[in-house]
Amino acid sequence: MEKILYLDPFSGIAGDMFLGLLVDLGVDPEELKKRLSKLGVEFELRIRKVNKKGITATKVDVVFPGKEHHEDHIDHEHHGRHLSEIMKILERLEDPAREKATEMFETLAEAESKVHGLPKEKVHFHEVGAMDAVIEIAGAVVGLELLGVERVFCGAVNTGSGFVMTEHGRYPVPAPATAELLKGIPIYMDQKVRAELVTPTGAVILKELVDEFGTPILRIEKVGYGAGTVDLEIPNVLRGYLGFLEGKSERDILIETNVDDMNPQLFGYLMEKLFETGAKDVFYTPIYMKKNRPAVKVSVLCSEEKRDQILKVLFKESTSIGARVFHLEKVEAPRKVISVETEYGKIPVKVAYFDSEVVNVSPEYEACKKIAQEKEVPLKEIYNAVYRKISEVQGNV
């Protein structure tokens, strides 16, 4: 089964909170320090248990000689560095951590570049350029490796609200660079919490380390809490669940419209355009409408983010002038593709699991079709050969 980490950022996310969460979930601090020592930077990880509104959490501070760490959700005033300096430091890490950490700072540079109108090479990092952020981002990547996490899921992110003071003045929450990084990520702005809950470092962790946003079906092994610095109206902690994927639950939408006055030749093109735009599924259902008029119900499954784009295509490429939108929860069983050796050669087979049991085995159609044509045997014989072989090794799939 696939080992996953599910993040519940009900109080946002910052670099130190993520590090605290990883340690709380079982990362060995000494091994983490050992891996990060390759950066060639002198630092100390101060780790302690704290209480946030009745919740015990792990607090991690990155401390440098002569300088106290003070990252929190509020303060943005850190010393600055340019991207080239940071890249030279990160190059000392071992792969795959090196590759991912450098990608994360590239992403940060692009966000800052867009906000300030500068080439990314000339961006002067503030909160994200401080050496503690370098340690936090490198530590985030290394920590996930140490936990053996294969995929990271995340729920909707609370950004907080109000204004934050920066070197450039008072900015609305989320700050501009953070907002840029949060594009495509499901967020909500809690008006009851007048504080910055997501820092740029936290935002880039979400952007680059989270594989999917949505609620997975998982078997929980551990629950951990990483603490932030300031005290808020709510517990200032990042909660995470470490466990194994049993299935996946996604929040999708179903768009439907009934069409009774369109040239049938246009339906094929409409389907192509909907898939090109990002539809997850498109299907047509013959129906009878009022006055016994034959029609076609067009159904489109897509993500919430694609809704407006799908509706635009639907209205432009069909005669529809209205549509129904339904919010759905879709559950997927985890699956993997294995290769099965038969008398006709190797054939890819999709195996689905639920509750740790194999619930479905499906040979890949296109591969079976190709072999059937090449060997000049019935397609059903290829399928039968696969099923015979699978029955012999059923306990090993």
UniProtKB/Swiss-Prot annotation:
Entry superkingdom: Bacteria
Name the record gives this protein: Pyridinium-3,5-bisthiocarboxylic acid mononucleotide nickel insertion protein
The keyword Lyase is annotated on this UniProt entry: yes
Alphabetized UniProt keyword annotations: Lyase, Nickel
The gene coding this protein: larC
Entry's family note: Belongs to the LarC family.
Biological source species: Thermotoga petrophila (strain ATCC BAA-488 / DSM 13995 / JCM 10881 / RKU-1)
Catalytic activity: Ni(II)-pyridinium-3,5-bisthiocarboxylate mononucleotide = pyridinium-3,5-bisthiocarboxylate mononucleotide + Ni(2+)
Protein function: Involved in the biosynthesis of a nickel-pincer cofactor ((SCS)Ni(II) pincer complex). Binds Ni(2+), and functions in nickel delivery to pyridinium-3,5-bisthiocarboxylic acid mononucleotide (P2TMN), to form the mature cofactor. Is thus probably required for the activation of nickel-pincer cofactor-dependent enzymes.
Group of enzyme by EC: lyase
EC number: 4.99.1.12
A single MF term (Gene Ontology): nickel cation binding
GO BP: any one term: protein maturation
Classification via Pfam families: Ni_insertion
